[in-house]
Amino acid sequence: MANKILTPITLWSDFNDSLPIQCTVLEEREEDGVLLRKLRCFGRDVGGVRVNIFAVYCAPAGETAPPALLILPDASQTADVAFAERFAKKGYAVLMPDYRGEWENCEEYTIYPEAIPYANYRSAGRRLDFADDTAKETSWYEWVAVARYCCLYLRSLAPERKIGLIGIRAGGEIAWQLAATFEGIACAIPVCAGGWRAYRGVHKFGESTELKMDDERYRFLAGVDSQAYAQYAKCPVLMLCSTNDENFDADRAFDTFARINPEMDKTFYFAARYNGHIGKTGLNDLDLFIDKYLKGREVFIPAPVEIGVEEDEGELVARIKFDRNGEVKYCDVYMAEDNLDSPTRDWTKCTLKREDGDDEQLFTLNAYENASRVFVFAKAKYSCGFAVSSKIAVKRLENAYSNSQKKSRILYSSTNGTDSFTIDRFDRNVLADCFLNTAEPPVRLTEGPLGIRGVYSSYGLKFFRINDARFRPGENGLLKFDIYSPRPTILQVCIGAGQGGTPVRYSCALRISGGECWADHLLSAKDFKSEINKPLSGLNAARYITFYSQDEFCINNLLWL
């Protein structure tokens, strides 16, 4: 069997899911109308030893057969009771297993047989990203096997009820495999997951876009990577992705979406500027999607936005086309320039130029005059409450346009609103380490002294614009900004710098005196130090900049000199 290339069909065709599950309830309680169980059940047999699955089960108290959800967390996470309870309160029976395996200072985990130590996430090693033998001898095979037996457990409780899938990051990759190979799934929602793990570090639009192939890569691509499973999807699919995801190339997200079985309902949404996280708009999409396919609610699911880049009256524009079957409430278009590295792109909002009938709009793309290409995507929200996005469109720029922009030293002023800023730290109000669950805008304008407003986030601010050629500081540039903080605080200013791979963080701690006044600060590269106290070589090496304080503050007039 070694070196055999297995496809999604051949990999799972002989899987034995006929073994008895034998569930044991470890703990059971009822609170606020929700039944909570912690349980163990058996998974597949490995050399005469069964996988011992730990999971959390939540359901509306007193209901016998509500529609069910299998929620698969990220590989570094475990069952999240709060997240499971959220859906139980909405009328779903939820099973959320641990599949990461043995974990420090944790007793509630899935126990894998000694023959497959790589099923434990911390011991996965090469089995996570390589199929050195076959796709069966990988961590993914064992994790999908856990998920299959979890589905069997849910089915054993109520054989006729519908089962939906939600998978987060690595859990989303598992969901792709399950949606393609397990009969009876009613809908699947992979979150920040869409395959192409074999292509990590290979930019879709770079000079060298081809992967160096050998037998091992063929085995991984054929039997593990999620894009191989998309064409076999047996249920409706909602893809939720984030544009600045460090672990998944946003440029390739729509490639996976396009491969989904055309006979299945499907749609797509991008969380703008987020890194492996989804905001309340995407969470609302998720709720509507499962309501439709698990509860039978009448919900209009729009098709993804169509987008193209063209010239109009001498200007560079994006043409947006909407689903004619729905009523659009608003549309936002985002543009980035030149940067092939999708996690560090500066996505800036574009201005509506005009409407062309009921179903088309044109947005101006005010690109830098020396930019060689633009990246553009759109997202639209419909009156039904559902929001969808387009693919990331790319166009090489070979002509001059009347709306081209000159180089600028002004990175930000409050006239820009909150444009280009995102969250630095997802450290609270986050469900399942992924969904930002807050009613207020996470990045907003707040008023400071003299009626002057600045940008603020209690999660800290992150800003990629300093990485754009149009705004990039000179070799000996200085960073200047105004800050308002009503009380004394320490502001952590960090710059991520370096070429290729994960940027190195260089930090500067500023003591802010506080008070009802704006204070200006001027920083040079040498003010920023790495963890080993190495100074930043120059601001022109910056790929992003962040501002964070435990106290309230706001920033304005960010520029370089």
Placement of each model-derived feature along the sequence:
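Cap/lid segment of the alpha/beta-hydrolase catalytic domain
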Residues: 85-88, 93-142, 195-204
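Surface beta-strand/loop "capping" patches
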Residues: 291-330, 335, 348-358
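N-terminal cap/lid segment of alpha/beta-hydrolase-fold proteins
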Residues: 17-63
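Short carbohydrate-recognition loop motifs
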Residues: 435-463
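Short beta-strand/loop motif that positions the catalytic acidic residue
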Residues: 233, 239-241
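Primarily recognizes the serine-hydrolase "nucleophile elbow" in alpha/beta-hydrolase
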Residues: 148-212
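Extracellular ligand-binding interfaces
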Residues: 454-533, 548-561
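Short beta-strand element of the alpha/beta-hydrolase
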Residues: 54-57, 65-74, 94
